[in-house]
Structures are given as C-alpha cells and as structure tokens.
Design a protein with these regions (language model features):
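Short, Lys/Arg-rich, polar N-terminal cytosolic tail immediately upstream
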Residues: 1-24
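A structural signal for multi-pass alpha-helical bundles of membrane permease subunits
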Residues: 22-311
Length: 311
C-alpha cells in the first residue's frame, strides 16, 4: 500500500513537471514568434512616432538645432479658422472622401444583395463594377480621362444636344467632382467580393424559413441578411473610422500636383515633408491622431454593444 502511494506521488510529480515544462516551452515559443513583430513595433512605430512628437513641439533654430515651442499648434488652429488656407481645404476634401466611403459601404451592401440573389442583369453589373478593379489604375484613369476630355466621346455626345461641355479637369470645382465620381465607382470590387462571400455563407435553411414566414424582398435584406453579415460590415466601418483622416483619392493621376484645391490631408502632409518642413506637419499629424483615437474607441464600444448573430 505504501509503495502504491509513493508510486502515485511520483507519477503526479512527473506529470506536474511535464506540464510546467510544456507551459514554459509554450511561453518561450510564443515569445520568439512575437519578437519580430514587437521589434518592428518598437523601432518602426514607436521610434518614428516619438521623433514626430518631438518635432511637433519644436521649431528650427538659426544654428540648425531645435527649440521647444507651441508655435506649430498655434499656426494650425489659426489656419483652421481660415477657410482659404491649404490645411483647411485639405481637411475638407479628406472628410468629403470619407463621407463618400461611408456612402459606398451602404451601397455596396445593397449591390452585394443584388448579386447574392442573382437578379436579372447581375452578370452585366458584375462586369461594370469589377472592370475598374481588374485593370491597373493608371491605364483605366487614362481611358477615363480621354472619355471625358474636350472633343472626347462624352463631349461629342453632349454636343448632339447642343451642349458644349467645358474641360472638366481644368477647374477645381469640376475636377474634384470628377475625381470623386471615379473613386466612388472604381472602389466597389474588393468590398463586393467580401460581402457577397459573407452572404453566400448564410445557410439556405435560414433563408427558406424566412420565406415561409413571409420575409422576402426588402424584409429579407433588412431583417435576415444584414444581421447575419453585420460583423463584416462593422469591420469595414471600424477600419474606415481608423482611416478617417487618411481618406484620399487618385487626384495625382488626374490633375497632378498643380491644383492645391483638390489636395487631401494625407498628400498635403507628404508634400510638406518632402519640401523639408517636418515640424508643422508633425503637429498636424499629432492633432488628428488624438482626434481619431477617441472616435475609434467610441465606435468600437457601440459596435460591440450590437448583439452578434451566429449560424
């Protein structure tokens, strides 16, 4: 009896040691796997952004050094009070692109449902929406510019009705609208693929049961489809909030860098940094980072409040 107890205690001790060894080995393995990502975060994110924060609170001195100052922030708030400043216009354009992105998310869900139900004409619409995604941007934009150019196909067509179309890309007021239209139309491809894929995963039994209860058409879309693919839509929405101040469009392909009225905040900061002015852009980046952070956290909080549907 005594030998059996000793044997049992030894077995327990061996099993306990094995569990500790496995646990320690798992921790070491996990640490080694995460080490490259941690180093990448520390060097390329924390290191770079720490330098940006220091630049935001400093101004260049005559001897080439830097001195502490709040001038960059004072300049920013002064520019934001002036609608004619480049920063103000760049921010306004950026928010326009973001609102366009939100509208595109909503329309993508409707178009995805159209494809999911395989309604008449869905193949033609697939070609129409996916074509810009399959052809390189530079090629497709060149074709699009020729189509809307003076004496181009659109110009000649409108001329049949007595309307002489102006050069749309020469004036900021019309150039921005053309660029946003192209950006809106050409960005459906990837989102459509993901949302249609999410809808195709819905069990047919769920759809059949909804039809028996009289849930068809818009009711099916609103009460059945949307709740079941909400996680996919919410992920896109949250990513959009993260990039709210980074929204931009392909305006460089259309008008180059000679039209500041169509700049977005992201490109304006890049252009300023390229010209050697790092302090003021760093301050602007810091301000909008501090604005975006609570927006992301609040949005995530309310998204998590929505009850997810599993199937």
């Amino acid at each position: 009896m005594k030998n059996n107890c000793e044997t049992g205690q030894q077995s327990l001790a061996i099993n306990s040691n094995k569990k500790v060894a496995i646990k320690d080995g798992g921790i070491i393995f996990s640490t080694l796997m995460l080490l490259p990502a941690i180093l990448h975060f520390l060097v390329l994110y924390c290191g770079v952004n720490l330098n940006s924060i220091l630049l935001a609170f400093s101004v260049p001195k005559s001897d080439g050094g830097q001195e502490f100052s709040l001038y960059n922030f004072q300049r920013f708030f002064a520019n934001m009070a002036n609608p004619e400043s480049q920063v103000y216009m760049a921010l306004f354009n950026t928010l326009e692109y973001y609102l366009l992105k939100v509208c595109k998310y909503a329309l993508t869900s409707i178009v995805s449902y159209f494809f999911y139900k395989k309604l008449p004409g869905h193949i033609a619409y697939k070609i129409l929406f996916f074509l810009p995604s399959m052809i390189p941007d530079m090629v497709y934009i060149s074709i699009f510019k020729q189509f809307i150019s003076k004496y181009g196909p659109l110009y000649e067509f409108l001329g049949l009705f007595g309307y002489k179309m102006p050069s749309l890309l020469l004036e900021p007021s019309t150039a921005e609208g053309v660029i946003m239209f192209y950006h809106f139309w050409s960005g459906f491809g990837p989102q459509l693929l993901i949302q249609v894929g999410a809808m195709n995963r819905i069990p047919s039994d769920v759809i059949d049961a909804a039809k028996i209860d009289g849930c068809v058409g818009f009711k099916e879309f609103w009460f059945i489809i949307l709740p079941l693919v909400f996680e996919t839509i919410a992920t896109y929405f949250l990513l959009g909030i993260v990039e709210i101040f980074q929204s931009t469009g392909p305006f460089l392909f259309f008008v180059g860098s000679d039209m500041p009225e169509v700049y977005t905040l992201q490109y304006w900061i890049f252009q300023q940094t390229l010209g050697g002015a790092s302090n003021y852009p760093a301050a602007i980046g810091l301000v909008f980072t501090m604005l975006a952070l609570p927006l992301v956290l609040i949005s995530r909080y309310f998204i998590n409040k929505v009850e997810t549907v599993t199937y």
